[in-house]
Every structure is written in C-alpha cells, then in structure tokens.
Amino acid sequence: MPDYQFWSERWLNNQIGFHMNGPHKSLIEFIDLFKVHKKIFVPLCGKSPDMIFLRQYGLEVIGVEFSEIAILDFIKENNLKMIKHEVRDLIFYEGDGFKIYQGNLFKLFEIDLAGVTCCYDRASMVAFNQQERVNYSQFLKDIVKDLTLILAPLLDYGEVLDAGPPFSVTARELNLLYGKNFELEVLRSDETPLRDNLKSKGAIYEKEVTWLFKKKING
C-alpha cells in the first residue's frame, strides 16, 4: 500500500511541491489521444489541474484520492458543485462531470469504474513502491475491464529501489508488468538535472518519460 501517513502529512502541512499549478505539458501535447473516449480514470488525483483540463476537453473524470484535504481543495479552488455520497465503506464526491472517490484505490470494485476506457496516470505509479506497482497493474487488469489506453508521464532514474517516493519506473519494469496486454510507446523523454539525493543512492541519470499504453487486440 502507498505510504498514506507520508502523503497525509504532506497535505496536512501543505508540503505539496509535487502539485502543479497548470496541466502537465505531456497532457496538453497528447490530449487528442483521448478524443474517442468518454470516461477517464485519474488515480491518486490529488487536486490536480489536469482534471480540469480533461473535463474541459469533454471527458467525464473519475478520480480516487485518499486525502480529504486534497479533494475539498479541488472543489473549492475550482468553484465546483459536488455532493458527498457514501457507498459501501467508500466516500465519493460527485458533480460537474467529476466523481472522486476518497480512500484506498484498491478498495474500488469493477462497478465503481464501469465505462472507464482510458487512464491518465501522473501520480500513482511513481507513488507506489515496486511491489505495489505489481498490485496496481493487476488492479487495472481485474477492475478496469474496458481499459484500452493509458497516458503516463513517469520518472526514470534507473533501478534505484529505495529512492522515493516518487519512485523510478523503468522501461524494463513496464514491459514486465504491462507488455503482455499493452503495446508500449515512449512519446517523449526529457532529461532533468540529477538531484543529489538520487546521486547518493546510485542513480546516474534522471528523466521524465511519457508513455503510451495501447491495449493489444488479443491482450
């Protein structure tokens, strides 16, 4: 499971350097990949402006986020009208084309993500450690049954297991976890200055790689 205490403290103390004030450059560049889709899944969504951008594009946005602070900030900062509901042991907020579940992503059922055909993942793969990423890949396969496309801007600084969160996600790992069911393509790769904390852990490079996952016909 993600380190909920770590992330909760970050939100509580407003230590959210990972939060962006505008949509991600790769989402802007590749938004038309979603033109034939209607409903998109945004895991560990925080209060990301990416969701506003996706909604303005015409997509119904289904998010999941464990931090109530993040969800309430998202609603307030964007002047949204969303109503709080409860189903099973899950809380969710719905309205204005958004539905955001509050809680553990792995407690969602297939019915909660019915109709979702695409996913924008800027936050979850890099938040999960290696074993959690295995569980997450299985979750997408088992729960998001109609998923055919994923756009994922990820971080890559090699196989440095204890450097995170955010964690490194390599091409080798993605092929092991998703290669059977998805065609994987690098859409862009941006080198970034190697941070000292990563260098001290053995990393020799740091980059942001935007991946496209397209479901194989027989995948």
Regions found by a protein language model. Give the residues of each.
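Class I (Rossmann-like) S-adenosyl-L-methionine-dependent methyltransferase catalytic domain
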Residues: M1-K38, K47-M51, G63-F98, Q102-D112, ...
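Class I SAM-dependent methyltransferase "Motif I" SAM/SAH-binding loop
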Residues: F41-G46, S124
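Gly/Ala-rich phosphate-binding loop of Rossmann-like dinucleotide-binding domains
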Residues: R55-Q56
